[in-house]
C-alpha cells in the first residue's frame, strides 16, 4: 500500500486484529477527531484516544462531542489530577467525580470514545472492583434509615454540609436528604415517608429547586481510596514497613489513623490496597487504541519530572513519600500493553491511509484594510464547495452573522453537524468549538472556524479560564507581588508569597509561586494559574492569620461569605429589575466598523476591559 492510498473520512479503516496496526496519515485541522467520531459509530468496541498533553485532551473532547452529537455513543475522559507529582493537596472534586464515573462505566462500555493524556495513563488506579463494590443504589420504595445512610455516605467519602453545591456533598434536613453523587450531572433530593423513599428528584444546586423525578440513583464512592477499617489498617501497616520515622510527629499518618481524609492522599494510593490496577485492566478486550506523536518521549519526560520531584521531597521526615514505581507506571510498561489491543497510529507511514483532507488557505481578516475579508470573498467566488462557518457561542455567532451580512454573505443557521450534512445550503453557520477547520475536497465541504477568520484573538479568549476573577484585587503581573506579601488562593485561603521556584515537569522547566501557610506548609502554584491568586485586602498585612492547608477552615469562611453575597445579590437584582422597566435610547451598532475599530487596539484586552466593552455595547444596543 502506498502513502497515497485514499479513504473516505466518513468511513475510515479500522484495524482487524492486534497484530496488524492501522495507520492514518496525519490529517489537517479538526479532521482527526472527525474521523475518530465517524469510526466510533460503527466500531465493534470503544476507542481509547491517547493525547500528548492535557490541552490536547480538552480540545479533542470538545471537537469529538460536536461531531458525535446525536450519535449512539458517548465521549468522555479520564482527566489528569492537575496537581504536581507528590503534591500536598488533592484534585478538585469535579475532577475526582469525572474520573470515578469513567472508571465505573468503562468495563461495560461497548461503544464510545475515551480521551486521556499520556501522563494520566501513567498513574496507578484503584483495583478494578473497588468502585462497584463501594457504590450504593437508592430506589423509590426502598427502606432507608437516615442514620445509616449518613454513616455510609461519610464512610464513602462524602462531606456533610448545610446546602449541597458540589460533587461529594450531602445534607440532611428532617426527612429530606440532598446528595450530589460523584459522576452525576446534577444533585438529587431524596424525600422519605416514614422509613421508605417516597421520591427521588434532580435539583438545581444554585436555585435549590427540584427538577425531574427519577426512579433510582447510583452513588459512587467519594474518592479513589478507602478510609474504612481495612483501608486504614493497610495504610498503617505499609507505613510502618516503609518508613523509619517518629509516627507521632507525622500529621499525615495521624490523620489517616483517625479516619480523616487529608489532602494529597492520592499519592499514597498504593498502600491502601494489596494490589493496584492500570487503565488497561478497565478496558474491554474489544478496545481500539488510537494515538499520535511520540508518546514514548512524552512519557520519558514526565518520568524525569517525577523522579526530580521525588528527590526534592523525599527528605521530608514529617511527610515521607512513596517511591515513583509505587505511584506511577513507566512508559515502557504502558506501551507494552498496546500489543494486546487493536491499534490506530496517526503518522506518515508507508502504509498509511490518506483521509483526503486539505488545509484551508489563509482567511485571516485584515481589519486595517477597507475590505478586510477579501480572502474569504475570493474563496467563496472561486469555489463551489458548501461552507460551514463555526462560531464558539451563540453571541459570537450573532456577531459573525452581522459581519458576514455586511460583505454580502448570508449563511443559514444549522443546529449541528449532522443537520448540515443532510441539507444542501451553500452557506451555513453553527455553534462549534473548533480550533481549526478543514477542507474535504471529495465531499465539496469547507469548515471555517472563527479562529481562521480573526486570527489568535479567538484562541486567546478560549484559553482564558472561565473562573477568572473580575475584581480589582486580581494579580495581572508578577511585579505586583513582593516577597512576604499576604495573598489569597481561591481554593486554599490566606498565605504568604515566598517567591518563585523553577520545577521541571513533563520535560519542561515551569515557574511556580511558593505560598506559605500555617505551620510552614507550602503550596506551589504554576505561574499560568496566577488568576487563582489575589492580594489580601485586609489592613493589617503584618499580622494576617494564615490558613491551614488540608482543613475545612477556608471552606467555612467561603460559605459564610457566599451567604452574605447572596443577600447583596438579591438587593441588586431588585434594583436591576426596576431599571429594566424603564426604556432608554437604542443605538444601532455598525458591526463591521466596530470590529475594524476593535482590531486596531494594539494590545490584548484584560478580562475587565473585555467585560466592560461587552456590557457597554450590549446596553447601548438595548432600549
Protein language model regions, located:
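Major-groove DNA-contacting interfaces characterized by cationic-aromatic clusters
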Residues: 543-550, 554
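A short, hydrophobic C-terminal helix/tail in secreted or cell-surface proteins
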Residues: 619-623
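Conserved beta-alpha structural segments and adjacent helices that either
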Residues: 1-542, 561-586, 593-594, 602-603, ...
Amino acid at each position: 500500500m502506498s502513502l497515497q492510498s485514499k479513504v473516505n473520512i466518513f468511513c475510515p479503516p479500522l484495524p482487524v486484529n492486534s497484530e496488524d496496526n492501522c495507520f492514518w496519515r496525519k490529517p489537517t485541522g479538526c479532521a482527526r477527531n472527525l474521523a475518530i467520531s465517524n469510526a466510533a459509530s460503527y466500531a465493534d468496541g470503544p476507542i481509547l484516544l491517547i493525547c500528548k498533553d492535557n490541552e490536547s485532551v480538552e480540545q479533542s473532547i470538545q471537537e469529538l462531542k460536536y461531531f458525535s452529537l446525536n450519535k449512539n455513543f458517548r465521549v468522555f475522559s479520564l482527566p489528569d489530577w492537575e496537581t504536581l507529582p507528590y503534591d500536598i493537596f488533592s484534585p478538585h472534586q469535579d475532577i475526582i467525580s469525572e474520573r470515578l464515573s469513567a472508571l465505573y462505566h468503562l468495563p461495560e462500555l461497548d461503544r464510545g470514545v475515551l480521551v486521556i493524556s499520556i501522563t494520566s495513563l501513567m498513574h496507578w488506579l484503584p483495583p478494578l472492583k473497588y468502585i462497584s463494590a463501594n457504590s450504593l443504589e437508592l430506589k423509590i420504595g426502598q427502606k432507608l434509615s437516615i442514620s445509616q445512610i449518613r454513616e455510609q455516605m461519610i464512610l464513602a467519602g462524602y462531606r456533610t454540609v448545610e446546602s449541597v453545591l458540589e460533587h461529594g456533598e450531602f445534607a440532611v434536613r428532617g426527612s429530606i436528604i440532598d446528595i450530589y453523587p460523584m459522576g452525576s450531572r446534577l444533585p438529587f433530593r431524596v424525600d422519605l415517608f416514614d422509613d421508605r423513599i417516597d421520591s427521588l428528584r434532580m435539583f438545581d444546586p444554585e436555585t435549590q429547586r427540584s427538577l425531574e423525578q427519577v426512579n433510582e440513583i447510583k452513588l459512587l464512592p467519594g474518592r479513589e481510596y478507602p478510609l474504612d477499617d481495612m483501608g486504614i489498617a493497610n495504610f498503617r501497616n505499609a507505613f510502618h514497613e516503609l518508613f523509619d520515622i517518629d509516627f507521632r510527629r507525622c500529621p499525615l499518618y495521624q490523620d489517616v489513623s483517625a479516619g480523616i481524609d487529608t489532602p494529597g492522599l492520592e499519592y499514597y494510593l498504593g498502600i491502601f490496597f494489596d494490589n493496584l490496577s492500570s487503565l488497561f485492566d478497565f478496558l474491554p478486550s474489544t478496545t481500539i487504541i488510537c494515538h499520535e506523536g511520540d508518546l514514548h518521549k512524552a512519557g520519558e519526560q514526565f518520568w524525569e519530572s517525577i523522579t526530580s520531584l521525588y528527590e526534592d521531597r523525599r527528605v521530608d521526615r514529617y511527610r515521607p513519600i512513596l517511591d515513583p514505581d509505587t505511584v506511577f507506571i513507566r512508559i515502557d510498561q504502558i506501551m507494552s500493553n498496546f500489543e494486546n489491543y487493536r491499534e490506530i497510529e496517526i503518522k506518515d507511514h508507508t502504509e498509511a491511509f490518506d483521509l483526503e483532507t486539505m488545509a484551508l488557505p489563509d482567511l485571516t481578516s485584515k481589519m486595517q484594510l477597507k475590505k478586510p475579508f477579501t480572502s474569504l470573498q475570493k474563496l467563496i467566488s472561486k469555489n463551489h464547495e458548501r461552507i460551514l462557518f463555526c462560531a464558539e457561542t451563540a453571541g459570537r455567532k450573532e456577531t459573525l452573522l452581522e459581519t458576514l451580512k455586511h460583505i454580502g454573505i448570508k449563511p443559514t443557521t444549522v443546529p449541528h453537524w449532522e443537520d448540515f450534512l443532510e441539507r444542501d445550503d451553500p452557506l451555513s453557520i453553527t455553534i462549534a468549538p473548533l480550533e481549526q477547520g478543514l477542507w474535504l475536497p471529495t465531499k465539496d465541504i469547507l469548515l471555517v472556524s472563527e479562529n481562521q477568520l480573526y486570527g489568535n484573538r479567538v484562541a486567546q479568549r478560549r484559553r482564558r479560564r472561565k473562573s477568572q476573577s473580575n475584581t480589582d484585587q486580581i494579580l495581572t503581573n508578577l511585579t505586583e507581588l513582593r516577597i512576604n506579601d499576604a495573598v489569597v488562593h481561591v481554593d486554599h485561603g490566606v498565605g504568604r508569597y515566598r517567591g518563585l521556584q523553577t520545577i521541571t515537569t513533563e520535560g519542561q522547566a515551569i515557574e511556580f509561586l511558593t505560598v506559605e501557610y500555617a505551620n510552614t506548609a507550602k503550596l506551589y502554584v504554576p505561574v499560568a494559574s496566577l488568576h487563582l491568586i489575589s492580594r489580601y485586602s485586609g489592613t493589617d498585612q503584618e499580622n494576617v492569620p494564615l490558613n491551614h492547608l488540608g482543613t475545612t477552615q477556608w471552606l467555612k469562611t467561603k460559605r459564610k461569605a457566599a451567604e452574605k453575597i447572596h443577600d447583596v445579590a438579591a438587593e441588586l437584582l431588585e434594583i436591576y429589575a426596576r431599571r429594566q422597566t424603564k426604556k432608554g435610547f437604542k443605538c444601532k451598532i455598525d458591526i463591521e466598523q466596530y470590529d475594524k475599530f476593535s482590531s486596531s487596539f494594539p494590545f490584548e484586552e484584560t478580562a475587565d476591559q473585555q467585560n466592560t466593552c461587552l456590557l457597554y455595547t450590549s446596553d447601548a444596543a438595548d432600549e
